[in-house]
Regions:
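Short beta-strands within extracellular/lumenal beta-sheet-rich domains
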Residues: 94-121, 132-134, 166-168
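C-terminal segment of classical bacterial N-terminal signal peptides
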Residues: 27-36
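Solvent-exposed strand-to-loop "edge" motifs in beta-rich extracellular domains
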Residues: 67-71, 112-117, 123-132, 140-142, ...
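Sec-dependent N-terminal signal peptides
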Residues: 16-27
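Exposed low-complexity, polar/acidic, P/S/T/G-rich flexible segments that act as propeptides
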Residues: 190-207
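Extracellular carbohydrate recognition and processing domains
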Residues: 52, 144-180, 187-195
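Extracellular glycan-recognition surfaces and repeat-rich motifs
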Residues: 50-53, 59-98
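N-terminal secretory signal peptides that target proteins for export/translocation
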Residues: 1-17
Length: 207
């Protein structure tokens, strides 16, 4: 059960802040996007965290297994790269053999995907490859006026020396009935480096 007990620094203002912004701007920002007021399309789901007691269904973030070339994976990488070696639990597939390494000062942003109020949680696998920096996780909401970024959690330097699943992290709040384009961004502060693999979103968990 150690995957649920990682020493994360969670930012509780995220849901309240994004909720206020969304409430004030959703109509103005998204009303012109005809399909904004609707649920996201159904996704193929699995139960990748069942062995840690989490039997919820999750879908893989686009490119979130980090298998293939950088162009096939589609993530925006800066001082980060696809590297050999998968997380050791092989929750996405036994043939997987790659993960993402982010060096100090580097960033990695997922492709934009559709998110709605039924998708508040996400999880992934991580380990600190070399010490010296925190791993910050951000939710980036895309709007016609530019991206809105909120820090979701910070995984502290030294807290994950070996591969493990993270706790359930919160995607910034989305008003019921709306869908928005969002991406997840990982930032390594300071020195050191982190590995990330198999990034999943839970489309069903309530609250």
């Amino acid at each position: 059960m150690e995957g649920f007990l990682l020493p994360l620094v969670i930012h509780p203002r995220v849901r309240k802040t994004i909720g206020r912004v969304a409430a004030m701007t959703c109509v103005a920002v998204f009303a012109s996007a005809g399909a904004a007021y609707a649920a996201c399309p159904a996704q193929t789901t699995t139960t990748p965290f069942a062995q840690w007691g989490d039997h919820s269904s999750y879908f893989l973030v686009p490119g979130g297994s980090f298998e293939g070339t950088e162009s096939q994976v589609g993530w925006n990488l800066d001082n980060a790269e696809l590297t050999a070696g998968n997380e050791p639990f092989y929750v996405h597939g036994r043939s997987d053999d790659q993960s993402l390494t982010i060096d100090g000062g580097g960033t990695a942003a997922s492709p934009v995907f559709c998110a709605d109020a039924t998708m508040p949680d996400f999880r992934f696998f991580a380990r600190e490859d070399s010490p010296g920096g925190d791993l910050k996780v951000e939710g980036v909401i895309q709007t016609p006026y530019g991206p809105y970024t909120a820090t979701v959690a910070t995984i502290a330097d030294g807290s994950m020396p070996s591969w493990a699943p993270t706790a359930q992290l919160k995607i910034p709040s989305i008003p019921t009935g709306w869908r928005i384009p969002v991406s997840l961004r990982f930032v390594v502060s300071g020195g050191g480096s982190w590995q990330v693999d198999d990034v999943y979103v839970d489309p069903y968990r309530a609250g």
